[in-house]
Swiss-Prot record:
One of its GO terms (molecular function) is structural constituent of ribosome. This is Large ribosomal subunit protein uL29. Pfam families: Ribosomal_L29. Belongs to the universal ribosomal protein uL29 family. Keywords: Ribonucleoprotein, Ribosomal protein. The lineage of its organism: Bacteria, Bacillati, Actinomycetota, Actinomycetes, Mycobacteriales. It comes from Corynebacterium jeikeium (strain K411). SUPFAM superfamilies: Ribosomal protein L29 (L29p). Transmembrane segments: none annotated. GO terms for cellular component: cytosolic large ribosomal subunit. CDD domains: Ribosomal_L29_HIP (cd00427). Disulfide bonds: none annotated. PANTHER family: 60S RIBOSOMAL PROTEIN L35/50S RIBOSOMAL PROTEIN L29, LARGE RIBOSOMAL SUBUNIT PROTEIN UL29C. GO terms for biological process: translation. InterPro entries: Ribosomal_protein_uL29, Ribosomal_uL29, Ribosomal_uL29_CS, Ribosomal_uL29_sf.
């Protein structure tokens, strides 16, 4: 079963780790879209899961930008 990363786990990461996760998720989404276009995608559900993970990461970063949550690393955005 394809499951994403819960938001509470993302909130425990610092901004640098979140940015790394975001880059990795975008790369995975690109590869999944390429597989879908060529008919090689075996797990269609993974596309939606990765999209939601990207949205969660953006949400956590925006919460920190607005001061709604704190950065566990202690450094400013």
């Amino acid at each position: 079963m394809a499951t994403g990363t819960p938001a509470h786990e993302l909130r425990e990461l610092n901004n640098e780790e979140l940015t790394t996760r975001l880059r990795e998720a975008k790369e995975e989404l690109f590869n999944l879209r390429f597989q879908a276009a060529t008919g090689q995608l075996t797990n269609n559900r993974r596309l939606g899961v990765v999209k939601r993970d990207i949205a969660r990461i953006y949400t956590v970063l925006r919460e920190r930008e607005l001061g709604l949550s704190t950065n566990p690393g202690g450094d400013a955005a």
